[in-house]
Swiss-Prot record:
Role: Has antibacterial activity.
GO cellular component: extracellular region
Protein name: Beta-defensin 128
Similarity-based family: Belongs to the beta-defensin family.
GO biological process, one term: defense response to bacterium
SS bond list: C24-C52, C32-C46, C36-C53
Keywords: Antibiotic, Antimicrobial, Defensin, Disulfide bond, Secreted, Signal
Gene: DEFB128
Signal sequence residues: 1-18
Amino acid sequence: MKLFLVLIILLFEVLTDGARLKKCFNNVTGYCRKKCKVGEIHEIGCLSGKLCCVNDEENKKHVPFKKPHQQPVEKLSVQQDYVILPTITIFTV
């Protein structure tokens, strides 16, 4: 019976932060730590007051996304208060 009580208590025990490293938020590829390792830089702070440590070498591998070049849109000569959308109904088919 005592062993059963110990098992029940251990099931409801909450693990501390040391069990698994938390990832940073805002799509930053890093981990929340008190001190960054050698070769890591801190980008932003985490919610728990720790640093968001990002591996500097791995961060350089990622190429920033480039937006495709858009051609200028021709403007209408008449100012319209609404947008005309193409619609298809049963009667037009």
